Regions:
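A residue-level marker of the well-folded mature domains of exported/periplasmic proteins
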Residues: 3-4, 21-292
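Gram-negative bacterial Sec-dependent N-terminal signal peptides
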Residues: 1-23
Length: 292
């Protein structure tokens, strides 16, 4: 009986050591949604870098739901991951989730969207304010300084929507552009179509549209095509579908991010943190206008 107890104890100890060893090389990436090509590309970039650096990477989808996001983080603290990369569903709501990770001494890095009130070791993102300004200036250059424009906004409460809108309004307020309407379509293609249909009916003289992501831009494109109007549409993100539409002359332009690089840099910065190295609080990722 004593020998059996010893064997059981040894087995339990072996299991504990195995779990601990596995946790040491495990990171996680929590994405706001995987129902958007931009974030799928971000995931791919993170996975490639994690494999290169020898980490296991857990991927979780928050399905654009802050409560799901919170439960994802709670699950990861139980699983003992060593670092968490998070693309927040909401810049304010994510604070509670990040605090849970902080209490477990798990470093958190934000990707693309920031967190308003949380202890985050680094934020990896494009400068969305500059991107919004780039879109506004492109419209002025191609359509005219007095162009009548509409803006499709992303999910309210996200830093990306707030900052892209801020940048675009900087361009509008510093020019003779006339903003006819600005309404949210939640970064969603179908909502972009539906909202744009209503805005076209209310604003038949619109000349250009700035959509805060390519998914909304592509939805708006369908509405414009159905109306038969000649309206320039500028998107944001530089997704595969967005760039393809630009190359076909359907979208005027897209302000291109590099989501694969955002994901890759997130893992790279987390690796440095785990090795005790210092990382910048903000790691910028370059933007560029893609036009035909």
């Amino acid at each position: 009986m004593k020998k059996l107890a010893t064997l059981i104890s040894a087995a339990l100890l072996s299991t504990t050591v195995s779990v601990s060893a596995q946790a040491q090389d495990t990171m996680a990436i929590v994405l706001s949604t995987l129902n958007n090509p931009f974030f799928v590309t971000m995931k791919d970039g993170a996975e490639a870098k994690a494999e290169e650096l020898g980490y296991k990477l857990i991927v979780l989808d928050s399905q654009n739901d802050p409560s799901k996001e919170l439960s994802n983080i709670e699950d990861l603290t139980i699983r003992g991951v060593k670092a968490i990369l998070i693309n927040p569903t909401d810049s304010d709501a994510v604070s509670n989730a990040i605090r849970i990770a902080n209490r477990s001494n798990i470093p958190v890095l934000t990707l693309d969207r920031g967190a308003s009130r949380s202890d985050v070791v680094s934020h990896i993102a494009s400068d969305n304010v500059i991107g919004g300004e780039m879109a506004g200036h492109f419209i002025m250059e191609k359509v005219g300084e007095k162009a009548k424009v509409i803006q499709l906004e992303g999910i309210a409460g996200t830093s990306a929507a707030r900052e892209r809108g801020e940048g675009f309004m900087n361009a509008v307020n510093g020019s003779d552009l006339e903003l006819l309407a600005s309404q949210p379509a939640d970064f969603d293609r179908t909502k972009g179509l539906n909202v744009m249909e209503n805005l076209l009916a209310a604003n038949p003289d619109v000349q250009a549209v700035f959509a805060q992501n390519d998914e909304m831009a592509l939805g708006a494109l369908r509405a414009v095509q159905a109306s038969g109007k000649d309206v320039m549409i500028v998107g944001f993100d530089g997704t595969e579908d967005g760039i393809a539409a630009v190359n076909r002359g359907l979208l005027g332009a897209t302000v291109a991010q590099q989501p694969d690089l955002i994901g890759s840099l997130g893992v790279e910065m987390a690796d440095k943190v785990l090795k005790g190295e210092t990382v910048d609080e903000y790691v910028p990722v370059p933007l560029k206008i893609i036009a035909k």
